[in-house]
Amino acid sequence: MKQYLTFTEEVRHALENNLPVVALETTIISHGMPYPQNIEMAKEVEQIIRDNGAVPATIGIMDGKIKIGLTDSELEEFATNKNVAKVSRRDFAYILASGKIGATTVAATMIAAEMAGIHMFATGGIGGVHREGEITWDVSADLTELAQTDVAVVCAGAKSILDIGRTLEYLETQGVPVVGYRTDEFPSFFARKSGFGVDMRIDTPEEVGKMMNTKWDLGLKGGMIIANPVPESDALNHEEIEAVIQKALAEAKENNIAGKQVTPFMLDKVKKLTEGKSLATNIALVKHNAEVAAKIAVAYQKEANQGK
């Protein structure tokens, strides 16, 4: 397995010395945002993690290798190359074996992070059960990954375009703890509210770090969700975004958009219908998640190092 992994010097040094590391995905760069906002966001997020005492490890697949940490030129490649594949668990081996370039989703980033020994990951929002999922069976592989891979994910909830109620039901079935970070309500990506509660509320990085260590010390496989609402000043109104999503969903149906095309299509439509406000919110919530993830990574690593 190790023959597939390559590390930047910064990440290698951190892992060898038991320093806190935060994994980052590349799908948000290649498929989630337009250029140049995507590359600007990627670099800013990495710096936010450094400023909060941890080391960023942006993950992607290139030239038959799983890159744990990317150089500036590699980041640029993910931001501008139109042939970047979107990689989840099922595509992982194929993209790696064929030498193609692949951006990692939440699921694929978790797989690579665990291989590298990284247990903290910051993203925008997780995938989940799509609306009308009971008819289409369109359920993101992110959810099954969270059930089996030991990586905690800081996110602003599930993407608003999903069926949040069913997503939470599925996570409960899979035994994935959903922690509200300083919130009692599960956030819905662009909005702070969703109408659904979290399993438990935790207000400090230290308590989250302790829970992570305890979970894995017990041999309880799988990750956990740390739901961190978008800052109030950047949030969109829950009812307004819901109306926009209903409109975008109708268009997706008319155009027979399905499978892994749904999320990029919907995010693009929502961006147009909100006149770009959703993109600004998306960038703000990713930065906020990176800050919280770095603080928790520091607390988790301190706790883990004491137990060694």
Swiss-Prot record:
UniProt keyword Manganese present: yes
Cofactor note as given: Binds 1 Mn(2+) ion per subunit.
Function: Catalyzes the reversible cleavage of pseudouridine 5'-phosphate (PsiMP) to ribose 5-phosphate and uracil. Functions biologically in the cleavage direction, as part of a pseudouridine degradation pathway.
GO biological process: nucleobase catabolic process
Protein residues bound to substrate: K86, V106, S140, A141, D142
Keyword annotations of the record: Glycosidase, Hydrolase, Lyase, Manganese, Metal-binding
Active-site annotation: E25 (proton donor), K159 (nucleophile)
Swiss-Prot/TrEMBL cofactor(s): Mn(2+)
Annotated Gene Ontology cellular component terms: cytoplasm
GO molecular function, one term: metal ion binding
Catalytic activity: D-ribose 5-phosphate + uracil = psi-UMP + H2O
EC number in record: 4.2.1.70
Subunit structure: Homotrimer.
Residues holding Mn(2+): D138
Protein name: Pseudouridine-5'-phosphate glycosidase
Organism: Brevibacillus brevis (strain 47 / JCM 6285 / NBRC 100599)
